[in-house]
Amino acid sequence: MTIYEIKSYLSRPYAEAAFKFANENNIVDDWIYMIEEICKILKNIKIYSLSSFILKKNKNFLFESIKNNFDVYFNNFVKIIIENNRLIIFPEILNQFINLKNDQNNIENITIISKYKLDKKILNKIEKKIKSLIFKEIKINIKIDKSIIGGYIIKSKNFLIDNSIKNKLYRFSEYL
């Protein structure tokens, strides 16, 4: 199991519980904002990377320093995560929470990776094709990666289309 898979596995129950509560109370966007704020705080202090080794008094200090910024329900959520030594997975909780919201709203996040910035016409063609295949609204995130040599990679949580030259060379080398 990769680190990403472990974080994903550990964060899923927290994200699902948080989303269920936020959804039932019509405060999903508020919770996204609060989780984003916690992620920013943790990124700035970088202490969470050793979350299981942080002394209890430091965890309490961290919680006391942030609790006035959030409502009581979110504070309870944060407290549970701190007590279970899971601060390190907060960014993944955010990702999964957003994915749950998008699933509910029938939206698919798509990442398109290419060596160069893609032309608008090409992006529109890709968007139309994907929409016709998955019957969902899509949000496109574009990343530039010079290592793919050429072509593009289209991925979401449900599929991967690797049309990169790097992948084609790799597959060709397997035949040799």
Swiss-Prot record:
Endpoints of the signal sequence: none
Cellular location(s): Cell membrane
Keywords attached to this entry: ATP synthesis, Cell membrane, CF(1), Hydrogen ion transport, Ion transport, Membrane, Transport
A GO cellular component annotation in the UniProt record: plasma membrane
Membrane topology label: Peripheral membrane protein
Molecular-function annotations in GO: proton-transporting ATP synthase activity, rotational mechanism
UniProt keyword Transport present: yes
Keyword Oxidoreductase tagged: no
Pfam families associated with the record: OSCP
Family matches, as SUPFAM superfamilies: N-terminal domain of the delta subunit of the F1F0-ATP synthase (SSF47928)
Record's function text: F(1)F(0) ATP synthase produces ATP from ADP in the presence of a proton or sodium gradient. F-type ATPases consist of two structural domains, F(1) containing the extramembraneous catalytic core and F(0) containing the membrane proton channel, linked together by a central stalk and a peripheral stalk. During catalysis, ATP synthesis in the catalytic domain of F(1) is coupled via a rotary mechanism of the central stalk subunits to proton translocation.
UniProt xrefs under PANTHER family: ATP SYNTHASE DELTA CHAIN
Oligomeric form and interacting partners: F-type ATPases have 2 components, F(1) - the catalytic core - and F(0) - the membrane proton channel. F(1) has five subunits: alpha(3), beta(3), gamma(1), delta(1), epsilon(1). F(0) has three main subunits: a(1), b(2) and c(10-14). The alpha and beta chains form an alternating ring which encloses part of the gamma chain. F(1) is attached to F(0) by a central stalk formed by the gamma and epsilon chains, while a peripheral stalk is formed by the delta and b chains.
Entries under NCBIfam families matching the protein: ATP_synt_delta (TIGR01145), PRK05758.2-2 (NF004402)
Family: Belongs to the ATPase delta chain family.
Protein name: ATP synthase subunit delta
Annotated organism of origin: Wigglesworthia glossinidia brevipalpis
